[in-house]
UniProtKB/Swiss-Prot annotation:
Predominant location: nucleus
GO cellular component, one term: nucleus
ZnF C2H2-type span: 678-700, 706-728, 734-756, 762-784, 790-812, 818-840
GO biological process assignments: regulation of transcription by RNA polymerase II
Matches recorded under Gene3D superfamilies: Classic Zinc Finger, DNA breaking-rejoining enzymes, Homeodomain-like
Biased composition (Acidic residues): 528-545
Entry's family note: Belongs to the krueppel C2H2-type zinc-finger protein family.
Organism (species): Homo sapiens (Human)
Protein name, per record: Zinc finger and SCAN domain-containing protein 29
Length: 852
């Protein structure tokens, strides 16, 4: 009998426990309870459910089965390579199949009564020399099992061979039950589950099909025609798996609880909490408030809330259930029977109405832009989504709608990057600059997001951009950089700042109010200008020199906030800053470039007469907004000053026929006149932008401003920090459209997608071999070049792979982390341990086969 203390030895890898789990014999323990307990502990040591996610555990199981079903001639060769995941194993087999010149032999197999000749690969010579031990062939049948049960198909696992009427309760040790997978939970509930392994669309079951003891009627499910569409367009209908696993935001959860507190939903769920029709109606009601959820997601979320509620009731800290009060009202049957005439009464009774209440009815509110919305003041909160503080409501306003914010659904990193890239396109940039609350335009943005696989409503897109603006202003006001992870993208998109040449009429225009604007309004505008946040341009304008005598003007900020237009001009005091040596160099270059502008510039058309700036234009009776009220003689001057506001780029760099704004042209000229003007004083490396130099300087200074609050690890770059955070949150925002597999990095998704397309963009020029991963390609290139960049600091020996260097370094340190569980012998390489384990496997095989 194996000692339990041996299971807790440190330094053993999961492969050892996997082999022990698979080769476990019932005869080694005293009875069934000990056998089950031993298998449980071995399985947990192998799969490590406390560390790995469900997807990772499933991948380990599938990888093991995949290696088992491989042809015997290549199985040992693949196992010799020690693939860490299924994707790597598939790639190894594909590379082996496509390797030219490999001899093949034909094999005749019978498929449905017909003989088919297949080609069988011959494995490498190295793999033929390995000892082939098929685990399945040596596994003995447990004693006490009837012959009828032994005669079952070997393809059936232990779960399939069990009586379907028997349900195995989760085995609990130390108070921690082993978590069920989502698939098992759905099967136990009797729901159909059809895995989408080949990327096909969701399969629909025929009417009246049987799933276990439950009969599924297709006519009970709402048809696609009856489902409400966001903008009455068919392409908004998505399959369930497209939105599965999306994080539930705070406002979205409160909306769900407010809906469930209504009488019809509360009574129905109290009688039958698994009623799919009720959850379907809840999902439809959520959709009315801008949250796209399936009935299964609503049911799963409510089950999760119930679980956290029970934890608090059993003595866990209150933080375990953030919605304890709302759940207390529902679970304790304290919800008063309310009329079902609207969600507002239920929400107000449950205390769920938050700071985001509006004065519009949901049925009256559409996606189309209303004229009154331009004049409305949309309160922008500086708090995050988890803020519980309520904003006082206007007592004279109409009955509030619960939870205006439809942007509560979490936006992933790649989704936000795609969203900002779409907004930076010319057609959206120009249109949103003129009217940032155009709902039809946000509908087009949402449609473009849909093309990239992200499902969003127009209102969610608008709310997200407002949130990005808020976090951007926080950083500009001096808060920590991690407040706005997309600061650089927002800085390039939001700010438009002009260093204009001296102009007599310009100062007068900046200081005097426009005709049609009262002195009180002008004073109010000046006060708003003093309070406005200082914005940067898209070309690192913090480094830009202001020529002597120039007047600083700032065009209205792109996509103004709903309160009104931002400050029109810079405060003089804000221009006094500490400037580094790099900034001084930038100043000199810009001053030099400005003197050379006439040689390179080509004056384009400048007769725009439609400026949307609320500071420069007045709204007079009988005239539309945007009509000029200044004297006609100053029209050309005003237009020349308003080109940045209009987004016009009248200056063309003749060398490349590329158009720019005034400041962008100066920056572009600097890039041609002086290549990479920002030089690192430590290593001499040069950069084209000061921001890139600042990031590079952190390598020398060791500065890591982005610190993880969970584990304390620090990072130099915000992008690496965001990627690291997903380790703690478990977020995997990048989903494969073919198989549904999720990843926490976009690069991992791109590499994975190449396994479906067969694309291998990295081709070796020496031998012609192709790779789907740049790292594998780089390692292969070193075979031809002889490059060995990884040097041992102790003996100076070089290696082409970092893994080889780590294994070599253990020869100096004496570290042997891989220990044999049977004899205690330790090894510095996992491959050596695997080969050593085959010796014990052979010994056990001989012992079992020896006559007694």
């Amino acid at each position: 009998m194996m000692a339990k203390s041996a299971l807790r030895e440190n330094g053993t890898n999961s492969e050892t426990f996997r082999q022990r789990f698979r080769r476990f014999h019932y005869q080694e323990v005293a009875g069934p309870r000990e056998a089950f307990s031993q298998l449980w502990e071995l399985c947990c040591r192998w799969l490590r459910p406390e560390v790995r996610t469900k997807e990772q555990i499933v991948e380990l199981l599938v990888l093991e089965q995949f290696l088992t079903v491989l042809p015997g001639e290549i199985q040992n060769w693949v196992q010799e390579q020690c693939p860490e995941n299924g994707e790597e194993a598939v790639t190894l087999v594909e590379d082996l199949e496509r390797e030219p010149g490999r001899p093949r032999s034909s094999v005749t197999v019978s498929v449905k009564g017909q003989e088919v000749r297949l080609e069988k690969m011959t494995p490498p010579k190295s793999s033929q020399e390995l000892l082939s031990v098929r685990q399945e062939s040596v596994e003995p049948q447990p004693r006490g099992v009837p012959k009828k049960e032994r005669a079952r198909s070997p393809d059936l696992g232990p779960q399939e061979q069990m009586n379907p009427k028997e349900k195995l309760k989760p085995f609990q040790r130390s108070g921690l039950p082993f978590p069920k997978s989502g698939v098992v939970s759905r099967l136990e509930q009797g729901e159909p589950w059809i895995p989408d392994l080949l990327g096909s669309k969701e399969k629909e079951l025929p009417s009246g099909s049987h799933i276990g003891d439950r009969r599924v009627h297709a006519d009970l499910l709402p048809s696609k025609k009856d489902r409400r569409s966001w903008v009455e367009q068919d392409h908004w209908s998505f399959e369930d798996e497209k939105v599965a696993g999306v994080h539930w935001g705070y406002e979205e959860t409160r909306t769900l609880l407010a809906i469930l507190s209504q009488t019809e939903f509360y009574e129905a769920l109290r009688n039958c909490h698994r009623n799919s029709q009720v959850y379907g109606a809840v999902a439809e009601r959520l959709r009315e408030y801008g949250f796209l959820r399936t009935l299964e997601q609503c049911r799963t979320k409510f089950k999760g809330l119930q679980k956290s509620y029970r934890k608090v009731k059993s003595g866990h800290p209150p933080e375990t259930c953030p919605f304890f009060e709302e759940m207390e009202a529902l679970m304790s049957a304290q919800v008063i029977a309310l009329p079902s005439n609207g969600l507002e009464a239920a929400a107000s009774h449950s205390g769920l109405v938050g700071s985001d209440a509006e004065t519009e009815e949901p049925g009256q509110r559409g996606w189309q832009h209303e004229e009154g919305a331009e004049e409305a003041v949309a309160q922008e909160s500086d708090s995050d989504d988890m803020d519980l503080e309520a904003t006082p409501q206007d007592p004279n306003s109409a009955a509030p709608v619960v939870f205006r914010s439809p942007g509560g659904v979490h936006w992933g990193y790649e989704e936000t990057k795609t969203y900002l890239a779409i907004l930076s396109e010319t057609q959206f940039y120009e249109a949103l600059r003129n009217c940032h609350r155009n709902s039809q335009l946000y509908g087009a943005v949402a449609e473009r997001l849909w093309e990239y696989g992200f499902l969003r409503t127009p209102e969610q897109c608008r709310t997200k951009f407002k949130s990005l603006q808020t976090s951007y202003r926080k950083v500009k006001n001096g808060q920590a950089p991690e407040t706005c992870p997309f600061f650089e993208e927002m800085d390039a998109l939001v700010s438009v700042r002009v260093a204009a040449p001296p102009n007599d009429g310009q100062e007068e225009t900046a200081s005097c109010p426009v005709q049609g604007t009262s002195e009180a309004e002008a004073q109010k505008q000046a006060e708003e200008a003093d309070e406005a946040t200082e914005e940067d341009s898209d070309d690192d304008e913090e480094d830009t020199e202001i020529p002597p005598g120039a007047v600083i003007t700032r065009a209205p900020v792109l996509f103004q906030s709903p309160r009104g237009f931002e400050a029109g001009f810079e405060n003089e005091d804000n221009s006094k800053r500490d400037i580094s040596e790099e900034v001084q160099l930038h100043r000199t270059l810009l001053a030099r470039s400005e003197r050379k502008i006439p040689r390179y510039l080509h004056q384009g058309k400048g007769n725009e007469s439609d400026c949307r700036s609320g500071r420069q234009w007045a709204k007079t009776s009988g005239e539309k907004r945007g009509k000029l009220t200044l004297p006609e003689k100053s029209l050309s001057e005003v237009l020349s000053q308003q080109r940045p506001c209009l987004g016009e780029r009248p200056y063309k760099y003749l060398k490349y026929s590329k158009s720019f704004g005034p400041n962008s042209l100066l920056m572009h000229q600097v890039s041609h006149q002086v290549e990479n003007p920002y030089k690192c004083a430590d290593c001499g490396k040069s950069f084209s932008r000061s921001a890139r130099l600042i990031r590079h300087r952190r390598i020398h200074t060791g500065e890591k401003p982005y610190k993880c609050l969970d584990c304390g690890k620090s990072f130099r770059d915000s992008s690496n920090f965001i990627t690291h955070r997903r380790i703690h949150t478990g977020e995997k925002p990048y989903q494969c459209g073919e198989c549904g597999k999720c990843f926490n990095q976009s690069s991992s998704l791109i590499i994975h997608q190449r396994t479906h397309t067969g694309e291998k963009p990295y081709q070796c020029e020496e031998c012609g071999k192709s790779f789907n991963n740049s790292s594998h390609f780089s390692a292969h290139r070193r075979i031809h070049t002889g490059e060995r960049p990884h040097v041992c600091p102790d003996c100076g020996k070089s290696f082409s792979k970092s893994s080889d260097l780590r294994a070599h370094h253990r020869t100096h340190t004496g570290e042997k982390p891989y220990g044999c569980h049977d004899c205690g012998k330790c090894f510095s390489k996992s491959s050596a341990l695997n080969k050593h384990g085959e010796i014990h496997a052979r010994e056990k095989l001989l012992t079992q086969s020896a006559p007694k």
